A protein has these predicted regions:
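Long, hydrophobic alpha-helical segments that serve as membrane-spanning/inserting helices
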Residues: 6-234
């Protein structure tokens, strides 16, 4: 061996400690990125279903596509929905705040994390959904009992974080509202006769489609890098 080569067990104690800390940080960061990858994949799948409902409700209210009163209520309700997700960035923030980024040997993973935590796609999506005029208009227009039945029969199903198989079953499943036909017809007629609701729904649809472009187009390289450094899902 070269005189300049030092075996790990004979390395300077400070260097050895840094190497161990770097490995620990790297494992934590990779786990955070796996969780972030699942969240991004889930948010894309979930809000694609919300967008599809917004499209269907818009087409029905504009008179372009026939939709029964029952199905109009379901699609219009689901167009109001959104999901948040707990971000996993504590490890990266700790690396930055303590000046420890240099401890991470895997520069590709570090680069993917830096890109990921800069973009605000999820934050923008959640904020727009919370402040959506359509969500407010729908909730003011539809009878409370009808809304409760919609939430019970057609609202979100639980999904465990990290569950890839269940992503498509959280919102886009078939459902049936258990209400008298007269109540369904009255609620649907309230939607059909409300021009302010349709205008707000068009804005909601435009916002959703913009964010879907962010997920699948504008940020494609970021998500591709995230997939590469985290490997295949379990």
């Amino acid at each position: 061996a070269s005189l300049h080569e030092v075996c790990p067990e004979h390395a300077d104690p400070a260097e050895r400690a840094d190497r161990i800390r770097g490995e620990q940080f790297a494992e934590r960061l990779r786990d955070d990125l796996r969780q972030e990858r699942w969240l991004y994949d889930f948010m894309l799948a979930y809000h694609s279903d919300v967008r599809d409902s917004a499209r269907a409700a818009t087409a029905a209210l504009e008179g372009r596509t026939p939709l029964s009163n029952h199905d109009l209520l379901v699609q219009a309700y689901r167009a109001t929905q959104y999901r948040e997700g707990a971000r996993r960035r504590a490890t990266y923030d700790e690396l930055v705040s303590t000046g420890s980024l240099g401890l991470i040997a895997d520069q590709r993973m570090l680069g993917a994390a830096a890109q990921l935590y800069r973009i605000r796609t999820i934050d923008n999506l959640v904020l727009e959904s919370l402040q959506s005029p359509y969500r407010r208009e729908f909730r003011m227009s539809v009878d409370s009992d009808v809304q409760r039945q919609l939430a019970r029969a057609c609202g979100d199903r639980y999904i465990r974080p990290g569950d890839y198989a269940g992503m498509g079953e959280v919102l886009g499943f078939p459902c049936k509202i258990e209400l008298p036909p007269a109540a369904i017809d009255a609620a649907a007629e309230g939607l059909r006769s409300n021009p302010a609701l349709l205008r707000a729904l068009r804005l909601r649809l435009a916002d959703l489609e913009t964010r879907m472009v962010d997920f699948t187009g504008n940020n494609r390289e970021v998500f591709q890098a995230l997939h590469e450094v985290t490997g295949d899902p379990p």
